[in-house]
């Protein structure tokens, strides 16, 4: 990255400030909708909550936002960018060269973050819609019935997920202004209610946070941290969205967002101090603090904020999955780019999965209070994994002093470990749903990663130099018809002149393929997100071209587009003869036709393999049946493509023993 690019990344602008509002802070910005409500319920409701519990909980929220969100993520994690990209997989690409085991926290953290993508839309939208109960007309019509809330929430989620296929560039332009209004609303209403009881400002003193955890008045004990953690669940998303808005814009906008959020919590706390001990039923402090004439406006604004938060999380899930695919941690899925920019992704399988999961969660849990019981567990896991990777980044990549690295690891593992322990109790109260989703994603990741290792273990290679003479003779053999001018093989294994033996089997044995030029193309995914480079080795010929493509993990792997440029460059440099065409609608065309060959390896002799390896490879074959075809993944859907099935030659597996049965008559003859 050049100087100007780095300068732009670290620079803050007015437009970037507004854009950050709509992209980065959706999740953490909607937490005031449900965090205090969860804390109040955990303390036995409004009738039983004590002053110590209110001020202590506020103190815990303030210092959680300060230590985890501000210190860990805004001050430290944002510096760990991979060519201006953030998130757990970008962090992993920076440190994976230091230890192989780092793939484990990367996969666990990624799976947990993806599972959270199903719960967050359900919680935020349901919490916002439940505000309708504060409107007298709605309350008179439906009372405390939850069914209308569920139906409205499901309808909003349906619309939200259905519009993903069309892109979000148009509506995305209003996300920033709407969220700026939302945060201003939080800050102003919080400040107004703060005048009701300034004693809540005692919460700035961390003494009250520690005092609450040790106080007998704390009816939830250490598990109050499970509710407090809801205030900072969006911190991981803040890091993941680094590449969309830049470090400078986050550094400038976060203080404004943090102040507005804390004012909202303090306003709710002041109202709770004034009304504790009253019998008001199940209330949400967020809506309870508002005057009646603002309820409808607040519900509409909260719903818009919840939708924007959900949209940001959905888009983040698409990006996370696309990164995992290119890092070979997930199978290839169909990816579309409906927007005007590369960053706008749409993955139908992920969209459908999130929609079904979010809808199931709404129907299963019914209310936001029940959903909150399951919320946060997955994110505590992701944060612990990020802390692990950040520790390696600081010690090995940044060469920070060991004492400081040890201090960082100890402090945040301890804090996040407490949050994890407090959230773990949620497992039996609905947290198991998110854990099951995360476990399923992790299972697929583990299978895909391990199968890739086994593929290279059992794949045979041959030296192209040993077959150059045969290939040259074949392309000049008049007894064979020309198969195609250019035959292109896509290979996962090519090391200089060494290549997958199955490719040579396809050219020479299966049906000799006469061509003028044989191309062997391997795609190498780099740790830098936007790399676009290639290397060519023609092995001293003018008919064999070995191409290594180096593409960043954010780049689309559209082979024909890159190959077109490479062919032109080789012909212009004289390394590749021109392929003048007699018949063409393009006068003077110098490049012939192309045929792409995709080899699909099928497992053979599976019974002779170790049981675990057999299970991994057979499971991968089943998963591949529902994933995107290689032709579509490599942008070949408008090209001529042949898919051939070849056996996966297991070089390390012994042949089955068999003996000839000789009859007595044959013995006599011999």
UniProtKB/Swiss-Prot annotation:
The cross-references to InterPro entries, in alphabetical order and at most eight, read:
K+_transporter, K_trans_C, K_trans_N, Kup
Which segment of the chain is annotated as a signal peptide? none
What UniProt keywords are attached to this protein's entry?
Cell membrane, Ion transport, Membrane, Potassium, Potassium transport, Symport, Transmembrane, Transmembrane helix, Transport
Any single GO molecular-function term of the entry would be: potassium ion transmembrane transporter activity
Note the topology in the membrane.
Multi-pass membrane protein
Instruction: Describe its function.
Output: Transport of potassium into the cell. Likely operates as a K(+):H(+) symporter.
Identification of the protein by name: Probable potassium transport system protein Kup 1
Q: Which organism is it from?
A: Lactococcus lactis subsp. lactis (strain IL1403) (Streptococcus lactis)
* Gene name tied to this protein: kup1
């Amino acid at each position: 990255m050049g100087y100007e690019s780095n300068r732009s990344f670290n620079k803050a602008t007015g437009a970037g400030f507004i854009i950050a509002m709509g992209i980065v802070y959706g999740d953490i910005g909607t937490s005031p909708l449900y965090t205090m409500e969860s804390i109040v319920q955990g303390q036995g409701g409004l009738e039983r909550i004590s002053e110590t519990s209110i001020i202590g909980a506020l103190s815990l929220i303030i210092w959680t936002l300060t230590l985890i969100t501000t210190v860990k993520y805004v001050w430290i994690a944002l510096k760990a960018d991979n060519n201006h990209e953030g998130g757990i997989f970008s962090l992993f690409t920076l440190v994976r060269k230091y230890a192989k085991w780092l793939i484990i926290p990367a996969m666990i953290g990624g799976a947990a973050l993806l599972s959270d993508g199903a719960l967050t839309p359900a919680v935020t939208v349901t919490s916002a819609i439940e505000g309708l109960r504060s409107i007298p007309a709605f309350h008179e019509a439906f009372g405390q019935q939850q069914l209308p809330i569920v139906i409205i929430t499901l309808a909003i989620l349906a619309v939200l997920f259905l519009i993903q296929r069309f892109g979000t560039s148009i509506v995305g332009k209003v996300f920033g202004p709407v969220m700026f209004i939302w945060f201003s609303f939080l800050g102003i209403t919080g400040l107004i209610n703060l005048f009701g009881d300034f004693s809540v400002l005692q919460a700035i003193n961390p003494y009250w946070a520690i005092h609450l955890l040790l106080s007998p008045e704390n009816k939830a004990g250490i598990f109050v941290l499970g509710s407090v953690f809801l205030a900072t669940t969006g911190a991981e998303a803040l890091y993941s969205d680094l590449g969309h808005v830049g470090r400078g814009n986050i550094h400038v906008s976060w203080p404004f967002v943090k102040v507005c959020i804390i004012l909202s919590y303090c306003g709710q706390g002041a109202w709770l101090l004034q009304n504790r001990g009253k019998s008001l039923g199940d209330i949400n402090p967020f809506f309870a603090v508002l005057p009646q004439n603002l309820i409808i406006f607040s519900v509409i604004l909260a719903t818009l904020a919840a939708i924007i938060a959900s949209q940001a999380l959905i888009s983040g899930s698409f990006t996370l999955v696309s990164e995992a695919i290119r890092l070979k941690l997930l199978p290839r899925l169909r990816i579309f780019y409906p927007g005007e920019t590369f960053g706008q992704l749409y993955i139908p399988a992920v969209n459908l999965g999130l929609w079904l999961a979010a809808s199931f969660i709404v129907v299963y849990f019914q209310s936001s209070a029940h959903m909150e019981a399951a919320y946060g567990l997955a994110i505590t896991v992701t944060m612990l994994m990020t802390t692990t990777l950040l520790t390696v980044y600081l010690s090995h990549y940044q060469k920070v002093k060991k004492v400081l690295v040890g201090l960082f690891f100890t402090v945040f593992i301890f804090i996040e470990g407490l949050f994890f322990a407090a959230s773990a109790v949620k497992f039996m109260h609905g947290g198991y749903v998110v854990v099951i989703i995360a476990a399923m994603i992790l299972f697929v990741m583990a299978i895909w990663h391990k199968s890739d290792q086994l593929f290279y273990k059992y794949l045979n290679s041959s030296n192209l130099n040993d077959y150059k003479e045969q290939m040259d003779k074949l392309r000049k053999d008049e007894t064979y018809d020309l198969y195609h001018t250019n035959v292109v093989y896509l290979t996962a294994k090519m090391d200089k002149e060494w290549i997958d033996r199955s490719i040579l089997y396809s050219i020479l044995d299966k049906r000799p393929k006469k061509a003028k030029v044989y191309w062997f193309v391997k795609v190498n995914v780099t740790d830098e997100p936007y790399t676009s480079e290639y290397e060519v080795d023609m092995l001293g010929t003018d008919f064999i071209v070995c191409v290594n493509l180096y593409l960043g993990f954010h780049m689309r792997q559209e082979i024909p587009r890159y190959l077109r440029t490479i062919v032109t460059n080789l012909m212009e440099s004289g390394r590749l003869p021109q392929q003048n065409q007699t018949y063409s609608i393009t006068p003077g065309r110098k490049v012939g036709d192309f045929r792409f060959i995709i080899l699909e390896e099928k497992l053979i002799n599976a019974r002779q393999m170790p049981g675990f390896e057999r299970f991994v490879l057979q499971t991968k074959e089943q998963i591949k049946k529902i994933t995107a075809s290689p032709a579509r993944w490599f942008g070949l859907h408008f090209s001529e493509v042949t898919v051939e099935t070849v056996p996966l030659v297991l070089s390390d597996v012994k042949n089955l023993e068999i003996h000839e049965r000789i009859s007595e008559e044959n013995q006599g003859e011999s």
